[in-house]
Amino acid sequence: MPRFSVAEARRYGDQFVQFLRDPSREQESRREVLRDIYSQEFRTRTDIRTPSFSSILYALRVSHQAQVHGQTVHFKKARRRVVVADQYRRPRTDTEVSAPAPGQQPSSGPPAPQSRAKKWAEFIRGKHGVEIVSEYDQANGQIRFPVALDKTKTFTVQVQNHGAEAVTLHRCRPLRRLQELSFLDEQGVTQGQALVLHPGGAYPIQVRCLTSHNGFFRAVVMFEFSKEPDGSFSIGRSIAAIAQSPLARELGPSAPYRPYQASLQRPITVVTEDGVPPVSSLKNELEKEIPLGTYPYPKSLKETIMLGPKTSPDSSWMKMQSLLEAPLQPENYKQKFELLLHLEEIQLEVDIRRYDLQEVPMVQNRALLLLNVPGVAENRPSVLRGDHLFASLSSERDSSPRVLYKGYVHGVELERVQLGFSPKLMKKFVNDLKFDVTFTFNRLPLQVQHRAAAMAMQKGLDSVLFPSASCQRSLFTGIFQPRWFDRKVEANEEQCQAVKHIVTGMSRPAPYLIFGPPGTGKTVTLVEAIKQVWSCFKDARILACAPSNSAADLLCQRLLTNIAPRYIYRIMASSANYKDVPADVRPCCNWDDSEKCYVYPSKKLLKPYRILITTLVTAGRLVSANFPPGYFSHVFIDECGHAVEPESVVAIAGLLTTMDPDTNPNGGQLVLAGDPQQLGPVPRSPLAAQHGLGTSLLERLMLHNALYAKSDEGYNPQFVTKLLWNYRSHKAILKVPNELFYDSELKAYEGSEPDVRNFYCTWEELPNRGVPIIFHGVCGEDEREAKSPSFFNTAEIEVVVQYLQKLLQSQGRRGCPTISPKEIGIISPYRKQVEKIRLAITSKDPVLRALPDIGQLKVGSVEEFQGQERRVILISTVRSCSEYLQLDQTFRLGFLKNPKRLNVALTRAKALLIVVGNAAVLSKDPHWHRFLRYCRDEGAYRGYPYEEEPPEEDSLANHLDSLHLGN
């Protein structure tokens, strides 16, 4: 067969380079990966014979279209236009304003339709020459003034008539009465007595404030007028008193809030200059027999999102909507998850831009540049060795085309990232250069999920993912009588029941579900089941997975208590930091100490290990290796409720063979452990979340599959066990979550030994001794600063700091037991509040910052505390403005309208729960209303008085909608 000429190879090479221009492939430069893409994706598109990869690479090199440096290939740079599609942003029309991007909330006032925003502007506007003025006037109709605690503050608001005709001032009244604010005048206007205001005249109205609480006290005040022959009109002002401690003032906004106005909708032309990737010391002997595709999204999908809904039945939006709204079933499994994952990726492209940096310097360190990235230590953004970002010169921001320098991550230390850029940039680098930086995200999790969704039905998993019955076949001929590894499991009826059903395999081919509410020993039960399978079936091969490294490490640690390390192999991802691997896990993980790198042994070398432990995404490596059918007899997934369904399926499709009485009688057991009432996966795409990606496999089965439905007699123990004994929380802390989420079935375990859960029942700070709960009411202000869209509330931080001081300074006295900072956790749903609380504790407050080990006190979001517990939990809810509640619901923020987040937050505490928040705002949510009523009934409420607002006073927006503003 004749060989291809260089010209012919060049032609195919050009086609391959064009093929790589797809957004999901264009950043790839590793020679080995490019070879795989060429062989497995490009060449297989048609049956036409094509040159080898080495031939086209040679042709591109000699024609100066590519450069090869070792294992890295750099193709000639091409111009491209960058467009992103935000699914939170609707296309503009003449009558509506686009919804903000996630985290990109409006700059002032609550989110509202344009008509309502215009109404507020009209409400505060002077009319007919009448103006409202005071010494504390601020923009947008705001009057803000400082007050000191327990001292009356008085100032004057002047109603001035600058017009040519008299007007009548009928009344001055707040739309909602506030006990701190009162309004007085000589002629009784504040009591409804009319007053004629002649041209050039002014009338003073006194505003008085007296408060014994720090906070933010705001009333919207309406001045009602009439003028003949024009009729009545109104002018409004927002009058707010602010009582602050020095700490609160210090923690206030560092700069006025100015929302980040990203030019995301403006297509730009860029040229990419490739960088220098780190040298890979990875030893990968694990086979790659099943290819991993790139799974790019179609460009037309992005266009569909940008165009938005269309009324035409044959529009691309309607076609997409039809698939999204179709019930998930085996016939559309691949197509639906393919679409959901594409939508997720398109939104990820938008969201990663929140971390863009502008006008930032870098420092040269030999051949690398060092960049400070705030938040990288918390994976905000996530930056790992081998990832890449893009940097461009700030001075060339308006140039077209714009040169983007691709920088590969060589290492991450705290908040400093080491980057390898092209020699071209390094030659022009000087210390005073400023850069604009754009981050990227790792597509590997998306790729393995795409493959899993595609393989699921190919591998016959419909009876696993859509189970309808059991084969009624036990793995035991007689009665299973276990020798328990953990005696506490033996004493717990539900845990014992779950283990027995898992080991006998009576649910197969249907998965077995462990429904584990907070503190009920879900992971303990799962680990005992794994140990029993390992002990009872000498030919069993077990894959144990979890969504995160920390959860997978915990499985490994607990298994090692009874199983020798020679049977267990913990496979870490290549990006995992070895310093973070627990010491007792290191001897059985895939780190090669002599080579100082992770290794991935061949299937042959993995065979002696009967238990493999990985994260769900890393299980994709095992799928690529193509183990023989039936190799893994059991797959266990802990914390399954945290993962999107395709992520869980990564550990199933291609690894677990469906149980079959004839061909696979002893295998096919899938066990899922989790709690559908706690936080599930958090997709970035609102479309994907709404249509199934926000529901875990565990939750879908429990919600929509008859085998896992709860009857009057409870759950069918052949398929699911709900654990009932709570070992974590004091019964008072458990009561409300138990009622709201668990049908009041949970029982607080009471052992004979001294119980840590009772340690704070006699603490002097408790409003009611014996009830270790405090709800401290605060009337604060939702604030933002600079370009951060996240909210904070300094009034709540003050209270949190005061309680911390009492807990950590009164140890062993006044009923307060000895406690270390690491036994205390502080939860807040907003990133900026978390940052401000940390700043107060470690830097601003002189008492707390001087305490030893104060850095071990964890402050974080609800998501960061899921699966964890602390002796004491403090919660700062932040929200004090009911007008933002719809925003929280839209963007899945905060506690309100998010019962799962509330459930997780309340159930982290063992012995003491302190909640700080605005009761009037929180009570608008039915779940919070129940908790507040419980605190008040039990005498556990203190702080700012809590009075439920009447429905008619629920919203400023409602008032604006009903007002007659006049002209």
Swiss-Prot record:
Region (Disordered), start-end ranges: 85-117
Cellular compartments per GO CC: cytoplasmic ribonucleoprotein granule; cytoplasmic stress granule; cytosol; nucleus; P granule; P-body
This protein's UniProt keywords: ATP-binding, Cytoplasm, Helicase, Hydrolase, Nucleotide-binding, Nucleus, RNA-binding, RNA-mediated gene silencing
GO molecular function: 5'-3' RNA helicase activity; ATP binding; ATP hydrolysis activity; RNA binding
SUPFAM superfamilies attached to this UniProt entry: P-loop containing nucleoside triphosphate hydrolases
Motif (DEAG box): 638-641
UniProt KW Transport keyword: no
Major place of residence: cytoplasm
GO biological process, one term: 3'-UTR-mediated mRNA destabilization
InterPro entries: DNA2/NAM7-like_C, DNA2/NAM7_AAA_11, MOV-10-like_beta-barrel, MOV-10/SDE3_DEXXQ/H-box, Mov-10_helical, MOV-10_Ig-like, MOV-10_N, P-loop_NTPase
Location of the protein in the cell: Cytoplasm, P-body; Cytoplasm, Cytoplasmic ribonucleoprotein granule; Cytoplasm, Stress granule; Nucleus
Catalysed reaction, written as an equation: ATP + H2O = ADP + phosphate + H(+)
Domain of life where this protein originates: Eukaryota
Functional summary from the UniProt entry: 5' to 3' RNA helicase that is involved in a number of cellular roles ranging from mRNA metabolism and translation, modulation of viral infectivity, inhibition of retrotransposition, or regulation of synaptic transmission. Plays an important role in innate antiviral immunity by promoting type I interferon production. Required for microRNA (miRNA)-mediated gene silencing by the RNA-induced silencing complex (RISC). Required for both miRNA-mediated translational repression and miRNA-mediated cleavage of complementary mRNAs by RISC.
Protein family membership: Belongs to the DNA2/NAM7 helicase family. SDE3 subfamily.
Designated name of the protein: Putative helicase MOV-10
